[in-house]
Amino acid sequence: MFQVEAFFKNIILEDIIMAAITAAMVKELRESTGAGMMECKKALTETDGDMEAAVDVLRKSGAAKVEKKAGRIAAEGITRVASEGNTAVVVEVNSETDFVAKNAVFQEFVQDVADKALKASVDKAGDGEDVCAILDMKSDLEEKTIVIGEKLSLRRFEKLTGECVASYIHGGGRIGVLVAAEGATGDAVKEALTNIAMQIAAMNPQYISRNDMSAEELAKLREIIEESALNDPATLPKPILNKLIDKAINDKVWSDEDIATYEEHKSNMQYLFNFLSKEAASQLAELALADRATITADKIFNGLVEGRVSKQLKEICLMDQVYVKAEDGKQSVAKYIAEVGKAAGSEFTIKKFVRFEVGEGLEKKNEDFAAEVAAQLQ
């Protein structure tokens, strides 16, 4: 009898507590914590409507959620910049999905990270360093992880200071660029630097100029281009290619079928490799590699390699690149800078640039939709 009475008393008590928890209370708790509506209602019920105690309950459960998300891969996200005077910073903060990267709460958080990084005592952090600890944002990160519901990661930041600094954000934050210059200043130079930042975002140079490359880097580039040419006999100078073909025929390296194909199409060497077997082309490459010393000493071959090295340098060195806004489609970035400097009455030079592209170098998680749904239901 007493057990039945106690049971009904508990039900009545729960109803009273539930009735006392108003929609306004749930809304207030949601706004202060960012937690879901049902989580807020449950926390208020557990604490008999005590707002501070409910916040503690959500924090404790949230901490568990943060720990659970820690093992996930965060390779999406955005970049943001902040600047003050002649100093600017670019940051990259990662999320698990590009959907979250478009979230206003996440974007506001990343801007807060940029503002904090601008005032940091170090100019650069990342590559395994604890950026979160450096910026003293551990609690902020945990809070946003709870609110957003995904693993978030403060990956890296870098600051630049110069006589003139410009920034550019591309694709809603997919790429963030900083450029610092020394020499002339003013609105025209600032505009030119912004244009150059756009150039860097689009063309992804690796160096400011070829003078910034070490002798070892240039030698390595040449070696790669030589190796590529030897492995692709179709692109070799005609005299060298003819010698390799003669050797393939005379030494019976080629099959009778490939020799017959060559005899049929040798009058039009430009299309020969469209008809030769893959095996025949591979055999020519092997012959070229075996005769590397002779071929690499050939003046014609060296001319080909130098041409390809020069072309590659025009792609990876900012000053050598064709300026993306060039009206004639030919003007280099170096000539554009000289033109702006002349008009400004004083020269300026690029001191340094930083380019962050979201997720570069990070592992990305690939799951099919069914697997993703199944994982969420577990």
Where are these regions (language model features)?
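N-terminal assembly/interaction segments in proteins that build large macromolecular machines
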Residues: 10-11, 15, 19-378
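Accessible peptide chain termini
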Residues: 1-2, 18
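Aromatic (phenylalanine/tyrosine) cluster motif
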Residues: 2, 7-10
